[in-house]
């Protein structure tokens, strides 16, 4: 602003003063300059001897320039201030003197307008009442309309500022406002517009004081509602809409609310009556007004030949009043009768030109119909603005009204040549504006263009108004031959068909036309369509998107090449800008099944930057920035790991099992069987197991969708990068479910800090130095606090004693490619198909048989896979089977804690301890005996366990043989193929017992776990980690007895060995077959196991850890046994 510039250091510079470089160059402050300016203006009006600036013009010649002088003076900022009071006082005196004279009254009003706006508060309060009286005197005179208009403008400012000062507000309300209104009501007819402006100001700033004259004001406004002057009619409607707020209301505006509703119903009743009079007989089924409103008594001129015109003018005025009441702010809450208003709108829009007779007054009624429809559309727009999205329940009705109106006013639009305005464009423009407003208010819920007959009709009209007109020239035949045949008669030379350009039509090159014809309706259609696509794009049908692509892309290219220009609406820059806006909307909100035209849009926006119109070129530049952000984001995406893992979190480096990790997510009941046993490896094709599929985790929180491994990842903080989806992580021979991706390439390490939105119930830590089995060390903590450390053959120099009954050396598994999926007992996979029938165990990892032989040995042990459907840990993907099914979460937690402690000890003594399978079995027998002594009530169960142990030992021996032959691989595939990288020795946390609500695994599983070599062979073929899930039956338990070598040992091992995982392996291997069958025994067995485990840990921690370490060593060979699939082939 100029004031800000002048108040700065250079405020007094001559550059800021048009007067020249004379005396003002020495002025150093803005206030001083303003004082000189005020004195200069005063000198222009009345010369003074002491003025610093001599008058330039005589006073009589300064009057025409005074309004301009006031405006120029305002450019220099406020003239108020203590230092300017003297100058302002002089201006006040001048103003009062000029207002007292008829000849100089206009000049006095000019000075008063400056004083009212620029005077300080103290000066304003001092002179406000006197100024108000002066204005009232001016209103009572017969001055010219220009003087009255200026007086009303000053009055408006005066009332606006006085309403802000309580003392003045009270004084004016009680003593002056009624007189002012009376003076305004008495103005001459030629000053009616100024009178309405003054009344509007009084009702706006002093509504309560106007209540005494409410009746007179209402009559005055109604008499002007049907005025022919648009400005006067608009002012009368605005004033009438404020009538309900006049006067004193009750405490909460109740009286005002009732007045507002009465006025609205009265307007509706009057509008229904007027519509019936206008189109009597033209309505097929007129809607009768049933509202409580009383029809207004409007004056009518009898004998007027243009009564229809008067009715139309009244209809327009009352409709505007109704719309203003809906759209204007009101001091109290009101209830809008939406249904009644919509009924009136529908009744008005249903009047069609087809039903109007062309006799008598018919043509005149037809002439008025478009304007009547426009008033109804304006009312609909006001209703949408007032009610917003609360009109959604009437969305279908609104969606039908718009194409209905477009159909009514589409007659004769195709018969005109380019360059001519199409008929009814104003009505169609209003319809498209309402479409844009409706979508803007309701968004995608508006339901526009989302199918249905009305949507198709609306789209057809939109495309018609967007498409540029085409020159249509038709061939005509020689005269006298309408059919085109030559005339008969004298022979003559053959004649050629000529172009029919019309008799009175000039050649196309010299045609007269409007270059901006139809630009308004085209721009409105483009805006409405752009808004609809942007808000509802993904919900709109694919075919609609394709139609728009086929229209918009060629149209943009034609506009850029100048082919579409000429007499088309796209000569207007507004239409071209809206066309680019539509293209951007198609790009930002595409159909899910129709790719957006990204490449074409980028090219179009690049060329659009060369537009001559700054408005168009700037929009294209902005659109390019938006497209660049979409195609080349400068910031990496939040989830770079891959789409298949919805909530993966980076895996921290391997760390020792922590006893602090509680197994809070042990869902009791059969649910665990389905969800907790997901296998990391490929899902076996066994019929029952697929049902488990990617099992949703039973834990609360975001559902963990099946990961790339086909397993639900409940407990893992993140999925190892190598398990993430990727070409190197997908094996060709994948089974039904996604396969654990054992790739030969080293997996990328994931920073432990990153978490991609997934919750972190129990973190699992996996560290991969290489993709080779020997280089992989996995430390997973299960929900049951069980942690298993698997060191593939390469890492531990100690000989790998088979953890389960089988003692196959890890070398055999090592022989197969390094990537040998840990193989659960081959019998388990066989039983899994049958077992899943009773139990829906979590899907076993699909057998990695097809996977590359060199699958990385890293194995994932299901961390605390809750016995319930809780999210299965990736550890299950390994051949490790967590079958411990307990009905009591407490027992599982205790066992898990013991197992975690044992796991820590195992990891420490892993390399040092190596024991034979016989010792391992003896420990299991001792644990069983301890359980029997501790729990006499469960003697029967203990006996069954012993029997099962014996059976499992035999089965383990058989499994060892089977594994050596590689037969277990196929079985594992059927049951639950363990992930090729997971060694069978890894014992899943005891939470898996919950996974299988059926009987808990008995020591037989431990025996099998001790047979990692055979299991590894089978795992290589099938990698069934989920086999434990399919161990619900005893037979299955026996089969699992072989596979449990890969599965986690039961808690019994935990007691015997300091490391919890060995006990889990024993229990799981034994329970893999037995526990699944006797679910009731599971809790008791687990409790006995937990107690005996505590004792065994103290007594035989070292021995147990050694046995388990041997088992774990054997497990890596199982991972290496992924070649077993190839071995069976060989």
UniProtKB/Swiss-Prot annotation:
Pinpoint motif LXXLL motif 3 by residue range. 111-115
What are the Phosphothreonine sites (modified residues) in this protein? 488, 745
Q: Where is this motif: LXXLL motif 7?
A: 271-275
For this protein, the record's SUPFAM superfamilies field holds: ARM repeat
Please tell me which stretches of this chain the record labels as motif LXXLL motif 2: 69-73
- UniProtKB keywords: Acetylation, Activator, Cytoplasm, Isopeptide bond, Nucleus, Phosphoprotein, Repeat, Repressor, Transcription, Ubl conjugation
Task: Kindly list the GO CC terms recorded for this protein.
Answer: cytoplasm; euchromatin; membrane; MLL1 complex; nucleolus; nucleoplasm; nucleus
The UniProt entry annotates the motif LXXLL motif 5 at 177-181
Q: Where is the composition biased (Pro residues)?
A: 639-671, 685-703, 794-824, 835-860, 976-998
Sequence motif LXXLL motif 8, location on chain: 364-368
State the similarity comment.
Belongs to the RIX1/PELP1 family.
What this protein is called in its record is Proline-, glutamic acid- and leucine-rich protein 1
Q: Which organism is it from?
A: Homo sapiens
């Amino acid at each position: 602003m100029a004031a800000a510039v002048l108040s700065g250091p250079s405020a007094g510079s001559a550059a800021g003063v048009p007067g020249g470089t004379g005396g003002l160059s020495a002025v150093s402050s803005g206030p001083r300059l303003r004082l000189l300016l005020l004195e200069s203006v005063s000198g222009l009006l009345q010369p003074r001897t002491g003025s610093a600036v001599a008058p330039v013009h005589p006073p009589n010649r300064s009057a025409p320039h005074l309004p301009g002088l006031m405006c120029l003076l305002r450019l220099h900022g406020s003239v108020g201030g203590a230092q300017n009071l003297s100058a302002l006082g002089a201006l006040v005196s001048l103003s009062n003197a000029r207002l007292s004279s008829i000849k100089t009254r206009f000049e006095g009003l000019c000075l008063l307008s400056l004083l009212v706006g620029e005077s300080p508060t103290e000066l304003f309060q001092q002179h406000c009442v006197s100024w108000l009286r002066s204005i009232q005197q001016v209103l009572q005179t017969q001055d010219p309309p220009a003087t009255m208009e200026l007086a009303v403008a000053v009055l408006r400012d005066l009332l606006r500022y006085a309403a802000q000062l309580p003392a003045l507000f009270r004084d004016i309300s009680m003593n002056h406002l009624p007189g002012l209104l009376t003076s305004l009501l008495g103005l001459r007819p030629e000053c009616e517009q100024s009178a309405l402006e003054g009344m509007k100001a009084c009702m706006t700033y002093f509504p309560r004081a106007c209540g005494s004259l409410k009746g007179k004001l209402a009559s005055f406004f109604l008499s002007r509602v049907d005025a022919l002057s648009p400005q006067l009619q608009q002012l009368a409607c605005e004033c009438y809409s404020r009538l309900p707020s006049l006067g004193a209301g009750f405490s909460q505006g109740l009286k005002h609310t009732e007045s507002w509703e009465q006025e609205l119903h009265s307007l509706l009743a009057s509008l229904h009556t007027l519509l019936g009079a206008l189109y009597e007989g033209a309505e097929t089924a007129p809607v009768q007004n049933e509202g409580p409103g009383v029809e207004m008594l409007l004056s009518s001129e009898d004998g007027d030949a243009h009564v229809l015109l008067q009715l139309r003018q009244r209809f327009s005025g009352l409709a505007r009043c109704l719309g203003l009441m809906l759209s204007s702010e009101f001091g109290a809450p009101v209830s809008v009768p939406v249904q009644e208003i919509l009924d009136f709108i529908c009744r008005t829009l249903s009047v069609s030109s087809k039903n109007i007779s062309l006799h008598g007054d018919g043509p005149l009624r037809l002439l008025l119909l478009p304007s009547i429809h426009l008033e109804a559309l304006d009312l609909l727009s006001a209703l949408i603005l007032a009610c917003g999205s609360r009109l959604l329940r009437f969305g279908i009705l609104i969606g039908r009204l718009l194409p209905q109106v477009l159909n009514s006013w589409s007659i004769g639009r195709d018969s005109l040549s380019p360059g001519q305005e199409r008929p009814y464009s104003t009505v169609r423009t209003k319809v498209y504006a309402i479409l844009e407003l409706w979508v803007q208010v309701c968004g995608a819920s508006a339901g526009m263009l989302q199918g249905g007959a009305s949507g198709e009709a609306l789209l057809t009209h939109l495309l018609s108004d967007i498409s540029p007109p085409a020159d249509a020239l038709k061939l005509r035949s020689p005269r006298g031959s309408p059919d085109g045949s030559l005339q008969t008669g004298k022979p003559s030379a053959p004649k050629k068909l000529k172009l029919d350009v019309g008799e009175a039509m000039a050649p196309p090159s010299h045609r007269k036309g409007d270059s901006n014809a139809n630009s308004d309706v085209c721009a409105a259609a483009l805006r409405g369509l752009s808004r609809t696509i942007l808000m509802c794009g993904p919900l709109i049908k694919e075919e609609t998107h394709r139609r728009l692509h086929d229209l918009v892309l060629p149209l943009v290219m034609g506009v850029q090449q100048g082919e579409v220009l000429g007499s088309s609406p796209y000569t207007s820059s507004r239409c071209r800008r809206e066309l680019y806006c539509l293209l951007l909307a198609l790009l930002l909100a595409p159909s899910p099944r129709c790719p957006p035209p990204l490449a074409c849009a980028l090219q179009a926006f690049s060329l659009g930057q060369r537009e001559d119109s700054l408005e168009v070129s700037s929009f294209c530049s902005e659109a390019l920035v938006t497209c660049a952000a979409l195609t080349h984001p400068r910031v990496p995406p939040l989830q770079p790991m891959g789409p298949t893992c919805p909530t993966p979190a980076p895996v921290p480096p391997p760390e020792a099992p922590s006893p602090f990790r509680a197994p809070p997510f042990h869902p009791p009941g059969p649910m665990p069987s389905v969800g907790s046993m997901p296998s990391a490896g490929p899902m076996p094709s066994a019929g029952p197991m697929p049902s488990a599929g990617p099992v949703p985790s039973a834990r609360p929180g975001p559902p963990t969708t099946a990961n790339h491994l086909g397993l639900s990842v409940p407990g893992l903080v993140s999925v190892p990068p190598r398990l993430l989806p990727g070409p190197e992580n997908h094996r060709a021979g994948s089974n039904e479910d996604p396969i654990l991706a054992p790739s030969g390439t080293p997996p990328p390490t994931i920073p432990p800090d990153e978490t991609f939105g997934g919750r972190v119930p129990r973190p699992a830590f996996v560290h991969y130095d290489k993709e080779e089995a020997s280089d992989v060390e996995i430390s997973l903590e299960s929900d049951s606090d069980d942690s298993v450390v698997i060191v593939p053959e390469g890492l531990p120099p100690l000989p790998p004693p088979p953890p389960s009954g089988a003692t196959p050396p890890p070398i055999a598994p090592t022989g197969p490619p390094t990537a040998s999926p840990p193989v659960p007992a081959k019998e388990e996979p066989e039983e899994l198909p049958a077992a899943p029938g009773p139990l829906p165990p979590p899907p076993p990892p699909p057998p990695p048989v097809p996977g590359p032989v060199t699958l990385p040995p890293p194995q994932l042990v299901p961390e605390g896979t809750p016995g319930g459907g809780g999210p299965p840990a990736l550890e299950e993907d390994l051949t490790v089977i967590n079958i411990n099914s307990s009905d009591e979460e407490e027992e599982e937690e205790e066992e898990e804690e013991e197992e975690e402690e044992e796991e820590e000890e195992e990891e420490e003594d892993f390399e040092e301890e190596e024991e034979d399978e016989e010792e391992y079995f003896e420990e299991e027998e001792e644990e069983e005996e301890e359980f029997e002594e501790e729990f006499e009530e469960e003697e029967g169960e203990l006996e069954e366990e012993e029997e099962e142990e014996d059976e499992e030992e035999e089965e383990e021996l058989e499994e060892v043989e089977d594994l050596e032959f590689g037969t277990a691989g196929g079985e594992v595939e059927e049951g639950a193929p363990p992930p090729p990288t997971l060694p069978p020795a890894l014992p899943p946390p005891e939470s898996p017992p919950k996974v299988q609500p059926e009987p808990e695994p008995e020591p037989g599983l431990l025996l099998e776990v001790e047979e990692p070599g055979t299991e590894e062979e089978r795992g290589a073929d099938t990698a069934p980690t989920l086999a434990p899930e399919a161990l619900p039956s005893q037979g299955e338990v026996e089969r699992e007895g072989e596979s449990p070598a890969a599965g986690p040992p039961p808690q019994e091992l935990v007691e015997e060995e300091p490391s919890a995982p060995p006990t889990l392996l024993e229990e799981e291997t034994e329970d893999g077959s037995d526990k699944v069958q006797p679910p009731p025994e599971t809790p008791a067995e687990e409790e006995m196991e937990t107690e005996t485990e505590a004792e065994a840990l103290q007594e035989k921690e070292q021995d147990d850890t050694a046995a388990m370490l041997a088992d774990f060593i054997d497990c890596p060979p199982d991972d290496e046994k992924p070649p077993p699939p190839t071995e069976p082939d060989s």
